[in-house]
């Protein structure tokens, strides 16, 4: 049983006790008044009966006296009749229906209790409905908040993707422009080298003559390898130092392979540019020869 029901029961018991005491006092006062009224009515009836008897006796006495006066002495010898006095019974006052105040109080208390119970049930039903509505409202709010969070995350991801695409596009454009600039620079450099290629060969021959004996390609390779290759001294190294040395050697090999690949690509590009320039030179020479022949024929004419 909850605290509210206990308080309600205590209040109802107090109200019942007070109403029972008040009704009992009222009932006693009504009984006292009713008894007093009955006694007064009974006393009044007796007085009225006595008065009627007295008046009747006086009337009878008066009649007898009148008769005696009329009849004279002859009638004096006759016995006087005894007057008949009927027993006058006072009217009986009906008691009426007796009111059961306990039953009325009990019914009233039952009615109040039923009304209070219905009010309590209605209150709890309304409270339950309000709690259910509050829970559903909280669920809707959480759902909307989760949907808004998902939309925000999607918008952020889409924005990041657009930014990455823009950066990638800008980087590609920059690389393309840089590659074109490098190609143009290499072409110009190759063209200048082709123009000075003959002088370079002559200078190289002169330097070789001055140095004396000409080195072969194999000797050049051995010399370069001897300069690059270092003595590997690992006898005095521990495990960690050996691991670091291995990482260093691996990095050097990686760098050499990268340089080799770059040199190969550079050699291919230079070879391609040389072929292109050579073809251009041949085309220019053919055009210049045809123009010179035309001028000569024209001059002889």
From Swiss-Prot:
Query: Known post-translational modifications?
Result: Phosphorylation at Thr-216 by PRKCA induces significant reduction in myofilament calcium sensitivity and actomyosin ATPase activity.
What is a single cellular component term in the Gene Ontology annotation?
striated muscle thin filament
Residue spans making up a coiled coil are none
Ranges annotated as biased composition (Acidic residues): 1-42, 50-74
UniProt GO MF annotations: actin binding; tropomyosin binding; troponin C binding; troponin I binding
Q: Which Gene3D superfamilies match?
A: 1.20.5.350
Report whether Membrane shows up as a keyword of the record.
Answer: no
Q: Where are the bilayer-spanning segments?
A: none
Q: Where is the composition biased (Pro residues)?
A: 82-93
Q: Which InterPro entries match?
A: TNNT, Troponin, Troponin_sf
Alphabetized UniProt keyword annotations: Acetylation, Muscle protein, Phosphoprotein
Taxonomically, which superkingdom?
A: Eukaryota
* Region (Disordered) residue spans: 1-99, 125-223
Using the record's annotations, give every residue carrying the modification Phosphoserine: 2, 211
Name positions with the PTM N-acetylserine.
2
Q: Please verify whether the record's keywords include Phosphoprotein.
A: yes
| SUPFAM superfamilies per UniProt | Troponin coil-coiled subunits
Tissue occurrence: The major isoform in adult heart is CTNT4.
Record-stated family: Belongs to the troponin T family.
Q: How does it assemble?
A: Binds with troponins I and C to make the thin-filament regulatory complex, troponin.
Function recorded in the entry:
Troponin T is the tropomyosin-binding subunit of troponin, the thin filament regulatory complex which confers calcium-sensitivity to striated muscle actomyosin ATPase activity.
Q: What name does the UniProt record give this protein?
A: Troponin T, cardiac muscle
Q: Give the species this sequence originates from.
A: Oryctolagus cuniculus (Rabbit)
